[in-house]
Amino acid sequence: MGLVVAIHQPHYLPYPGFFDKMRRADVFVYLDHVAFTPGWQNRNYIKARTGPARLTVPVTRRSRGGPIREASIAQGADWQRRHESTIRQAYARALHLGMCADLLGLLYHHSWTNLGMLNLACDLHLTRMLGITTPWVLSSSLGEFRQTKTALLAEICRRLGAATYLAGDGCASYLDPEVLEVAGIELRWQGYRPPRYPQLHEGFLDNLSVLDLLMNAGAEAGRILTSGESA
């Protein structure tokens, strides 16, 4: 059985599916050289008492269209204080708030000027918290690429000697399977199903930041992500 590669753009406080894809792969490629566009790269949601609460890292206008790894965080927006305050209020009664203290310190008590570095530190820390050991490769470390879209994915797989590309379900509308087939790369779909687990506040919301899972499930978060079982 050949090497299975998953590829994903950097996200801020990613949802559990990001890490589910990672754990299913032999190698995880962090797609940090592609263009920054506002969205999951610089924002995500947690669950507050009133419902979903969005956390957005402000990014300078001149960063749009440039590589994610070079995107600059807008200074003077006081986003770190606001994010930490929102999180601590939302999870004041969470059983595992203390477990996330180091993560909050990393994100909100360091001076971040670059979104790429912030996301890399955030996502690596979360990976360790979940007990995932899949090795990472930064796409920016693989040399220059002229390809885009599915051709880019195929070229990354080729450079890594991958036999299989593990695709997230969200790319079904734009991924071209024929490009991978011509390149001799098997296409495998992730088939992700959001895990169910006890949450604070009324009702259940899925596809929040994985921070919600960690706050509520603690050390069991990795098991829940892996098995799909409830806490």
Question: Where in this protein do the model-derived segments appear?
Answer:
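Residues lining hydrophobic/aromatic ligand-binding pockets adjacent to catalytic sites
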Residues: 1-231
